[in-house]
C-alpha cells in the first residue's frame, strides 16, 4: 500500500505546480497557461504542427502531463493538457465529473486543437480515456495512447457493486 501512497503524494505535488518553466532533463520545458472555453490548460513545448491532447484520470491534473511532455516534445510534439471537472485548478468548482459535462468540454478542447495544429493525437488515462473515447469517437486523430482505459463502464460499475467493503 505504501507504493500507492507514494503515487498519490507525487500526484498532489505535480498538481500544485503552475505554468512557467519546468525542468525537463537538461533543458527547461516551456509551458504556457491557457484557458479553453473556461477550462484551465497547460501547453508544453515549443511551437509544432503536432500536438498530443493529454487527459488525466481520477485524482489527476494537467500538471501531471510533464513526464509525458518530456518524451513527446523532443520528438516534435507539443502537449496540451487540461483539468477535468473537480480536478487540479477546478477543485471546488460547480462542474461535476460527469459524462454530460466532461464530454462536451473535451469536444471543445479538440476543436481548439484541430484549429491550431495539423496533427492531433490523444494520450489519456483511465476515466479520462473513457470520456475522451466518447467525445472523440468521430474525430480524426493521428494516434491514441490510452493508459488503463475504461472500455466497458457498465461492466466496471456492475463489478464494483459486488466488491466487499
Ranges and model annotations:
Residues 58-70:
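The serine-hydrolase catalytic nucleophile loop
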Residues 72-91:
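Conserved alpha/beta-hydrolase
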